[in-house]
Swiss-Prot record:
One of its GO terms (cellular component) is cytoplasm. Residues 37-70 form a coiled coil. GO terms for biological process: negative regulation of TOR signaling; regulation of apoptotic process. Keywords: Coiled coil, Cytoplasm. Belongs to the TNFAIP8 family. It is found in: Cytoplasm. This is Tumor necrosis factor alpha-induced protein 8-like protein 1. The keyword Cytoplasm applies. Its main location: cytoplasm. The gene is tnfaip8l1.
Length: 186
């Protein structure tokens, strides 16, 4: 039997296209305005923290690729039942992470970087498990690159610290995340 499948070919083409075109313009086709604003703030705070524009761009580009590829796989029904259960656990963990991030911002003296870091690392592991058979080692490395940055305890402590520079970014991030939660997008 011939193993050629146009559906698989189209999916491979979509994944390849997404990996080559993870620019802001293309992301806007897949990511709504609020998400885009949150990503912009994550870029700004990352650039401020790393003092490296190129590294900040790479982290956000990898984040966008990760989100878009996950969406392509999900919309094309590529996950088996076990993987769908992992995706659902990932979605719930991201929801918990978002609620925790906003809560830590809104309620003074509640921030715990270990809690945030652990939630982010839990998300990373669930994502790796869900996409394991679908994406390349390079995609897994991108996931690690993104999560290594955002789960870094020093980064989190700086982001949630008293510095007015970071406070402004955190406020905009949390306002966007809160809006996404209200709209059921997280």
């Amino acid at each position: 039997m011939d193993s050629f499948s146009t559906k698989n070919l189209a999916l491979q083409a979509q994944k390849k296209l997404m990996s080559k075109m993870a620019t802001k313009t293309v992301a806007n086709l897949f990511i709504d305005d609020t998400s885009s604003e949150v990503l912009d703030e994550l870029y700004r705070v990352t650039k401020e923290y790393t003092r490296n524009r190129k590294e900040a761009q790479k982290i956000i580009k990898n984040l966008i690729k990760m989100v878009v590829k996950l969406g392509v796989l999900y919309r094309n029904g590529q996950f088996n039942n076990e993987e769908l259960a992992l995706v659902e656990r990932f979605r719930k963990k991201v929801h918990t992470l978002a609620m925790t991030a906003v809560s830590f911002y809104q309620i003074d003296f509640t921030f715990d970087r270990r809690v945030m870091s652990n939630l982010l690392n839990d998300c990373r592991e669930l994502l790796h498990q869900a996409i394991n058979r679908h994406l390349t080692a390079k995609s897994h490395a991108r996931i690690n690159h993104v999560f290594n940055h955002f789960a870094d305890c020093d980064f989190l402590a700086t982001l949630y610290g008293p510095s007015e520079v970071y406070r402004g970014h955190l406020q905009k991030i949390c306002e966007g995340v809160n809006k996404m939660l209200d709209e059921g997008n997280l």
